[in-house]
Amino acid sequence: MIEITQPAQEAIKAAIEGAGQPVAGLRLMVQAGGCAGLKYGMALELEAQPDDASLTFGEVTVLIDPLTREHIEGTKIDFVSNLEGAGFTFDNPNAKSACGCGKSFC
């Protein structure tokens, strides 16, 4: 379904450990918005929803709702650090186009 690189897994694990409370995992979302029409979102989830896909990558659980699954099939998620800062990147083969920031697509 999706690929999460080792650096991304480590960043997610650090966020979960820093949450201060138990979480079910990291939710990946695709929402309307951004400069290209759709945008990626991520949030720590206290509990999974019944229709979520629950994927495990190492020590990290990722939750994905059915609508998001349609948009991110085959996506590679990475975490990069460079002179411009640090953050997650999404390489989505389903995106027809993307904006320069890499956070939204259509």
From Swiss-Prot:
PROSITE patterns cross-referenced by the UniProt entry: HESB
UniProt GO molecular function: 2 iron, 2 sulfur cluster binding; 4 iron, 4 sulfur cluster binding; iron ion binding
Pfam families the record matches: Fe-S_biosyn
SUPFAM superfamilies for the chain: HesB-like domain
Gene3D superfamilies: HesB-like domain
InterPro entries registered for this protein in UniProt: FeS_biogenesis, FeS_cluster_insertion, FeS_cluster_insertion_CS, HesB-like_dom_sf
S-S bridge residues: none
GO BP: iron-sulfur cluster assembly
Family affiliation: Belongs to the HesB/IscA family.
PANTHER family reported for this sequence: IRON-SULFUR CLUSTER ASSEMBLY 2 HOMOLOG, MITOCHONDRIAL (PTHR43011:SF1)
Protein name: Uncharacterized protein in nifU 5'region
Species this protein is from: Rhodobacter capsulatus (Rhodopseudomonas capsulata)
